């Protein structure tokens, strides 16, 4: 809307007509720069690695939701689960996602279970495009991941699959080279 207003003002001031294609190009560019890139997926699907590579490629700040949760709680994710339980962790996670979802132009790597809380969807989607990373179950590491260590991965994936699909705007395979995944996401943003 502001871009259209600027177009009209410029046309009135300069007496030059600006084509709709130019307006659309500017809107896409502004939207591309301001919208957050949100990464979701199973624990170990490569969200952190993809976020770091995307941040470098696009010159954007990378935010790790789990790091912010750990800082807020003053303990590691496994410690939060062991001492306070999953419910406490999920509350902290939703608080962090609410704060980060309001920001602009960041790359946010989420925890694998953020999709289990329906209230997280509007927090992530309000200013972001949600990319779901998929990876072959055999390639998913479980070390340091509390739920992945106590639950069968195939069962966990089956339970979360419909939730990931519901949240995702775009699904990207992360079974190949990191550069290919990054390029696929960059192309989807255009």
Language-model region placement:
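Short glycine-rich anion-binding loops that position phosphate/pyrophosphate groups of nucleotides
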Residues: 112-115, 136-138, 177
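ATP-dependent small-molecule kinase phosphotransfer cores
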Residues: 64-122, 163
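P-loop (Walker A) phosphate-binding loop of NTP-binding proteins
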Residues: 42
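Conserved glycine(s) of the Walker
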Residues: 46
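A glycine- and Lys/Arg-enriched "phosphate-lid" helix/loop adjacent to the NTP-binding pocket
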Residues: 126-163, 167-170
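NTP-dependent small-molecule kinase module
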Residues: 11, 15, 21-33, 37, ...
């Amino acid at each position: 809307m502001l871009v259209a207003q600027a177009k009209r003002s410029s046309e009135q001031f300069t007496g030059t007509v600006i084509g709709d294609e130019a307006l659309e190009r500017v809107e896409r560019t502004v939207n591309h720069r301001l919208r957050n890139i949100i990464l979701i997926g199973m624990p170990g699907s490569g969200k952190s690695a993809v976020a770091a590579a995307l941040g470098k490629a696009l010159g954007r700040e990378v935010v790790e939701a789990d790091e912010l949760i750990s800082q807020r709680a003053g303990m590691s994710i496994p410690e939060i689960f062991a001492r306070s339980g999953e419910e406490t962790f999920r509350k902290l996670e939703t608080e962090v996602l609410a704060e980060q979802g309001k920001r602009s132009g960041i790359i946010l790597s989420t925890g694998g279970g953020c999709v289990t809380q329906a209230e997280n969807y509007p927090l992530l989607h309000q200013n972001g495009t949600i990319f779901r990373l998929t990876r072959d179950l055999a390639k998913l590491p479980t070390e340091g991941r509390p739920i992945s260590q106590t639950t069968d991965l195939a069962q966990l994936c089956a339970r979360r699959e419909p939730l990931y699909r519901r949240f995702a705007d775009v699904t990207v395979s992360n079974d190949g080279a990191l550069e290919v995944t990054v390029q696929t996401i960059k192309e989807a943003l255009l």
